[in-house]
């Protein structure tokens, strides 16, 4: 298993080459799916809650574009991919379709992405600021369904410890 977790590989050509090598070696690539140019400065999920709070949003598309790109690279190279901490209904649908096509892909979700929504950030507490961000109830329900139907293969904590001072910072300044 090869990964650069925490930082999705932004360059499609570099990722293509990585998948080609992984295919030759019989190694699975694990990908944190985030198009960083779409998430720069984002604090929480882009939706009605972030609009109401006046905070910069993180679009679902930032995850879904990279999931789509990597599925197509798997199709091209014959490599296998594991998608880390899926959080959107769209991503679950993409992985479900890839599996139906017989592609060698797996995925995981976190406990918080199957149980918590972006509405918790109305408290302005940085305790709920995670990467990828908490999403809508519709996304939570889609991730749960993906777990039930086998689209999502595992639950993983994606534990990223922070000192308490960083979680006590204002939401827009916390990591």
Labelled PLM ranges:
Residues 164-175:
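Conserved nucleotide- and phosphate/pyrophosphate-binding catalytic cores
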């Amino acid at each position: 298993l090869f990964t650069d977790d925490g930082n999705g590989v932004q360059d499609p050509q570099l990722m293509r080459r990585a998948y080609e090598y992984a295919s030759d070696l019989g190694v699975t690539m694990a990908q944190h799916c985030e198009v960083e140019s779409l998430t720069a400065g984002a604090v929480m999920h882009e939706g009605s809650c972030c609009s109401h709070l006046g905070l910069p949003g993180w679009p679902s598309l930032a995850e879904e574009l990279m999931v789509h790109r990597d599925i197509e690279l798997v199709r091209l190279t014959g490599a296998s991919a594991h998608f880390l901490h899926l959080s959107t209904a769209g991503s679950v649908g993409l992985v479900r379709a890839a599996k139906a096509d017989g592609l060698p892909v797996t995925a995981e979700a976190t406990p918080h992405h199957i149980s918590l929504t972006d509405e918790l950030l109305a408290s302005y507490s940085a305790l709920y600021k995670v990467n990828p961000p908490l999403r809508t109830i519709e996304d939570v329900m889609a991730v749960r369904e993906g777990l039930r139907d086998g689209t999502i293969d595992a639950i993983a904590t994606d534990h990223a410890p922070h000192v308490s001072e960083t979680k006590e910072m204002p939401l827009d300044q916390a990591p």
